[in-house]
A protein has these predicted regions:
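Extended beta-strand/beta-hairpin segments
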Residues: 1-56, 68-127
Length: 127
């Protein structure tokens, strides 16, 4: 039998139309979504702000990787909840000052439903 080697690098494509200074309509694969600013920042509030979208991507990656690692460890995870609280330095996005790290602190909390014991959950957390 021939082993199939998966690609380690793949090309990702995304298109975005920007009908205003705050709204970005994104299309990736066959999925569309809108990134926008809230009304108080001259947006139309049709979607999460760009910085909120970055945190949403972190939540999505946390979910995907945690479930893959759980599967690798043989753990049954029936539900996962990710909660993120971040301290965001707005000076960069307001062009007040150039900053290196916009998120001064990110607290990421994961709650899950599983039949695994605490030792197995701890192993999942460290992986």
């Amino acid at each position: 039998m021939v082993a199939i080697r998966q690609k380690t690098t793949v090309k990702q494509r995304l298109e975005a139309d920007c009908p205003s200074q705050s709204r970005t309509d994104v299309k990736v694969r066959d999925v569309s979504f809108t990134i926008d600013e809230p009304l108080e920042r001259d947006g139309t509030n049709m979607g999460p702000a760009p910085t909120e979208t970055a945190l949403a991507a972190l939540a999505g990656c946390t979910n995907t990787i945690a479930n893959k690692v759980a599967h690798k460890l043989g753990l049954d995870v029936s539900n996962l909840h990710v909660s993120i609280v971040a301290d965001f330095d707005r000076r960069g996005v307001t062009l007040t000052e150039e900053i290196d790290v916009p998120y001064e602190k990110i607290e990421l909390r994961v709650e899950l439903d599983t039949t695994a014991g605490q030792a197995e959950i701890d192993q999942l957390a460290t992986e």
